[in-house]
Amino acid sequence: MEYFDMRKMSVNLWRNAAGETREICTFPPAKRDFYWRASIASIAANGEFSLFPGMERIVTLLEGGEMLLESADRFNHTLKPLQPFAFTADQVVKAKLTAGQMSMDFNIMTRLDVCKAKVRIAERTFTTFGSRGGVVFVINGAWQLGDKLLTTDQGACWFDGRHTLRLLQPQGKLLFSEINWLAGHSPDQVQ
């Protein structure tokens, strides 16, 4: 289990100067050729998402104005707050800030031939399904994960096991993603 606080994470500026990324975790850890990766991006200007051939991207708007995502003849989608949207990352996808204001989103990418992610929003205590990887990010409220207290802009990632996240206040929201490995694949096979 690895814990993080978004306010203390290192920031990587994009080459096109349209935004920045805070990498939460990758699997395998610290590998450039990853099977899955979670990150938080701040988008300050219209631009294109980076291409990642062979990957699926699920993007969830955390804050800021809605964002229009366009990919040639494949889709035109308005990304609304806390509504995950999936697309293959090998296509050119243009992002347009509809309100002209900066937005922040959660991204999870998985290798299409190895694993699949599911992103959800939780508003009550729950236990993960025992997948072989996952990430949680507190949108608001106070949540307990094991012996750790997680509050707004904090979270954790793990590479196996079941975990209970307990809401400690009457209201709260938490984004979570679990990684499921496709038949014939396992994180145990990774060197």
From Swiss-Prot:
Signal sequence range: none
NCBIfam families: PRK11396.1 (NF008488)
Classification via HAMAP family: Ves
Family (UniProt): Belongs to the Ves family.
Protein name: Protein Ves
Organism: Shigella flexneri serotype 5b (strain 8401)
Taxonomic classification: Bacteria, Pseudomonadati, Pseudomonadota, Gammaproteobacteria, Enterobacterales
